[in-house]
């Protein structure tokens, strides 16, 4: 049931995001009953505005209500992915080339599962991460368990 709801929300959110010139980053559906939370993350190269979030929220909400896509009550939340956004797609590693990231892989690479460094490239399903000046670790994209940008204070 939860997968069907998530799939429907993704389809609607993708359609709305594209029509508004936005990228759909992620859809999460958590909980159930009256405590269900539907979280949509959107982005665009110049950054997301409050108005972008409001527009997507209004349009997605209207469609979900009209189609009665989510049983019961739910809270709809639309936001930007934030400064420490998740890296979910191969394109993310190319787009954020040169930025700091933290990547956790399923199987150890050189004795470790969690790596931090600067995104140095992405090719043939492999992420290049500069973990020290001149020291590159190659991490298979299909082994990534979790990855996000790291904001430097």
UniProtKB/Swiss-Prot annotation:
Against SUPFAM superfamilies, the record matches this protein to: YhbC-like, C-terminal domain, YhbC-like, N-terminal domain
* Disulphide bond pairs: none
Q: What is this protein called?
A: Ribosome maturation factor RimP
InterPro entries noted in UniProt = Ribosome_maturation_RimP, RimP_C, RimP_C_sf, RimP_N, RimP_N_sf
This protein's major location comes to cytoplasm
**What is the protein's species of origin?**
Solibacter usitatus (strain Ellin6076)
In terms of Gene3D superfamilies, this protein maps to: Ribosome maturation factor RimP, C-terminal domain, RimP-like superfamily, N-terminal
GO CC terms, sorted: cytosol
From the Swiss-Prot or TrEMBL record, state where the protein is found.
Answer: Cytoplasm
Which family does the entry's similarity section mention?
Belongs to the RimP family.
Q: List the keywords (alphabetical).
A: Cytoplasm, Ribosome biogenesis
């Amino acid at each position: 049931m939860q997968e069907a709801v998530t799939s429907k929300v993704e389809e609607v959110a993708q359609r709305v995001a594209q029509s508004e010139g936005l990228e759909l980053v992620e859809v999460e559906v958590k909980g159930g009953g009256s405590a269900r939370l539907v979280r949509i993350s959107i982005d665009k190269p110049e950054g997301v505005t409050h108005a972008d979030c409001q527009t997507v929220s209004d349009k997605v909400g209207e469609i979900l209500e009209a189609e009665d896509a989510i049983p019961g009550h739910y809270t709809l939340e639309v936001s930007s992915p934030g400064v420490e956004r998740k890296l979910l797609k191969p394109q993310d590693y190319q787009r954020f080339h040169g930025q700091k990231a933290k990547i956790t892989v399923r199987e150890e690479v050189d004795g470790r599962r969690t790596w931090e460094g600067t995104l140095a490239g992405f090719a043939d399903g492999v992420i290049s991460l500069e973990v020290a000046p001149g020291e590159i670790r190659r991490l298979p994209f299909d082994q990534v368990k979790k990855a996000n940008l790291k904001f430097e204070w």
